[in-house]
Amino acid sequence: MKFKFSIIIFIVFFHQSIIFANHKVYVIHGFAGFPLQMEKIVQGLNHSGYLTENYTYPSFSEDLDSVGRDLYRKVKYENFDTVSFVTHSMGGLVVRSMYQYMKPTGHFPFIYRVVMLAPPNKGTELADFQFNHVSKTFFGPNVENMKTNYDSYVNRLPFPTCEVGVIAGIRGKKPWFNPFLKEDNDGTVTIGSAIMGTEKDVAIINSMHILMPEKEKAIKLIIAFMKTGCFVKNKNLK
């Protein structure tokens, strides 16, 4: 029995060693975000032994389709054996946009895992409001891309085919917090909009949207999912 257990441990360790021998994690900020906002996540992953890149892109001026294409080209060019992604907000849509350019027969690194923080996977009602009432020139092309209607850009994007973990934020559905969002939300994205329905695991934490990348609980959940493919047993962390 002990011999079999030792064999299992060896196989698991050997498998993980192969994955992490040439494995890179791309950390991607959201709309109007910046690399410094994601630095605590980068540091947490680095301390856990992961090779990372704090990836940035022009979220105001370049549309999601172009950003996804640029990410695809970069990942393909760098040619790591295995890659993973940790994203905040619209960064999750950047990864989904990247999937449009991945061909089944084309050479591309194996995508191991993706962790999305507060992703507007089904759009956000704030985009509906802002697109209708504020100049597109001010916000750029991606506000329209994140509208909630069924045929909007975000709702036509492919879902990742790898293991995905979604971390959603909650601050309650009090009218004074955000009158435009009727469901439980983080001030920008509702829980229902964050969840795709295809992810492997979901965790909910008490956090405002913009502050989630700096939350210690979020970082611990990210590392847990990257290591094991799941979050902690108690997934509702206040």
Regions found by a protein language model. Give the residues of each.
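Short, solvent-exposed loop/turn segments at secondary-structure junctions
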Residues: 32-33, 92, 121-122, 170-173, ...
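Serine-dependent carboxylesterase/thioesterase catalytic core
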Residues: 23-29, 52-58, 62-161
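The serine-hydrolase catalytic nucleophile loop
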Residues: 34-40
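Sec-dependent N-terminal signal peptides
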Residues: 4-15
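A short, Lys/Arg-enriched amphipathic alpha-helix followed by its capping loop at the start of a domain
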Residues: 40-50
